[in-house]
A protein has these predicted regions:
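S-adenosyl-L-methionine-dependent DNA methyltransferase catalytic core
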Residues: 1-9, 13-27, 157-331, 335-406
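Core alpha/beta nucleotide-donor-binding catalytic domains of modification enzymes
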Residues: 2-106, 110, 114-118, 123-126, ...
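Conserved S-adenosyl-L-methionine
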Residues: 52-54, 114, 137-148
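A short, glycine/Asx- and small/polar-enriched loop/turn
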Residues: 63, 152-157
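Short, solvent-exposed loop/turn segments at secondary-structure junctions
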Residues: 73-75, 114-115, 147-149, 165-167, ...
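Short beta-strands and strand-loop turn motifs
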Residues: 109-113, 142, 322
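A SAM-dependent methyltransferase catalytic signature shared across enzymes that methylate proteins
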Residues: 128-143, 164-168
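A short beta-turn/loop motif at secondary-structure boundaries
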Residues: 149-152, 278
Length: 406
């Protein structure tokens, strides 16, 4: 058995998706921190007693380790909910960076939602990068789609990987997902991302009530109107495809804009899609903490179960979640998919095994690559952030490094 040589601290660990992936890759997680009690219970049951309950906005003694990993809470700028720029949790990104700069581990991994890039006009990006570059870290910061790493869902996230005085690599894609940028090229050499059906087909029939044969694999009975909506929706369709009499009142109010005389005009894009039936042969839409009941099973007339959501996040069936159903969905939806974490960890482990301490260069912090988009189009808000990063960290014109596709 290979000895676990490299140690890890997992800050803001949640249910432990990052820790699980890093453990499977061969790292040893020696300390994990969170403040949400269901997360602490879930982590302790599945991954070990090295988890601690603590508010990381307050002082704490952290153990020295090879790497620090983590995803500071994103609720203040998540697109899954209302953005709140004054949410105190936003400042935890800077706290995370300062922990790394002070402890000076050999490497770090950071994960967050795509809204992180444009939050506060790019201030959160600077809050992350400034202390780390000053401390000597050489950093890749890229937006990725977890589907390109074999996770059966289109999940766009921001990943940063850094090495202290040495140059880490960024993990290569392992799969190609239909509709993902570069899919027409990658499909020639990479296997397709698993579909929803491939990910879920070995689960037994969902029970009609808890506890179920597998934890979380049950579905409540639908109301009459919910059943009618489910029966009417075909794979790929959403609430806006329903006849008006089946649409939810709140959807109708927001889906129609009114002109001066009060007459409703045509439906607009940007209205909430409400429930949606997933396509069986595609990866899922992103699983989020607040989506319970939103996604309908591709064929069955019911929402996805909690366990099906966990599977789409690549948690094993024997991974037990604590708390009520809302807590469990929050833990699952906020987690880093363990499979994505494992790919990142394996790549970092290979880098560390190749790293020669003599290659260390003092005070050589820099941004090695910055890839803030997966498409050719750039919004004004994102263009502002790109310009901000270029002016702050790059001394020569290297736009191709900023818009890297690989």
């Amino acid at each position: 058995m290979k000895t676990k040589r490299h140690t890890v601290l997992d800050l803001f660990c949640g249910a432990g998706g990052l820790s699980l992936g890093f453990e499977k890759a061969g790292f040893q997680v020696i300390q994990a921190i969170d403040r949400f009690e269901p997360a602490i219970q879930t982590y302790r049951y599945n991954l070990g007693t090295h988890v601690e309950s603590h508010d990381l906005s307050q002082p704490i003694k952290l153990q020295p380790a090879t790497a620090i990993i983590g995803g500071p809470p994103c609720q203040g700028f998540s697109s899954a909910g209302l953005r709140q720029s004054k949410d105190y949790r936003n400042t935890l990104v800077g706290k995370f960076a300062r922990f790394i700069a002070d402890l000076r581990p050999c490497a770090f991994v950071f994960e967050n939602v795509e809204g992180f890039l444009t939050a506060e006009n790019g201030e959160r990006v600077i809050e992350l990068l400034d202390p780390l570059v000053e401390a000597g870290y050489r950093i890749h910061l890229r937006k990725i789609n977890a589907a390109n790493f074999g996770v059966p869902q289109h999940r766009k996230r921001v990943i940063a990987v850094g090495g202290l005085g040495w140059e880490p690599s960024f993990p290569e894609y392992t799969h190609t997902a239909y509709g993902a940028p570069g899919a027409h090229l990658a499909s020639q050499i990479l296997p397709p991302t698993p579909s929803i059906l491939k990910a879920l087909h070995t689960l037994p029939q969902a029970d009609s009530r808890p506890p179920g044969a597998i934890q979380g694999h049950f579905s409540r009975q639908l109301s009459e109107i919910e059943l009618q909506r489910s029966l009417a929706l075909k794979p790929g369709q959403t609430m806006r495809d329903l006849p008006e009499e089946l649409q939810h009142d709140s959807f109708r109010r927001r889906a129609f804009r009114r002109v001066r005389d009060g007459t409703p005009s045509e439906k607009r894009g940007g209205a909430p899609s409400g429930i949606k039936r997933l396509k069986p042969d595609d990866p899922s839409k992103a699983i989020t903490g607040g989506m319970q009941g939103e996604f309908l099973h591709p064929y069955e007339h019911r929402p996805l179960t909690i366990r099906e959501c966990a599977r789409l996040q690549t948690f094993p069936d024997d991974f037990i979640f604590f708390g009520n159903s809302t807590d469990q969905m929050q833990l699952i939806g906020n987690a880093v998919p363990p499979l994505l974490a494992e790919h990142i960890a394996k790549n970092l482990l290979e880098d560390l095994d190749r790293f020669d301490g003599n290659d260390y260069e003092e005070n050589t912090g820099e941004i090695l690559s910055f890839v803030p988009t997966l498409s050719s189009g750039v919004s004004p808000a994102l263009r502002h952030v790109i310009d901000l990063v270029k002016q702050r960290y790059f001394r020569q014109p290297i736009i191709e490094r900023l818009m890297l596709w690989d």
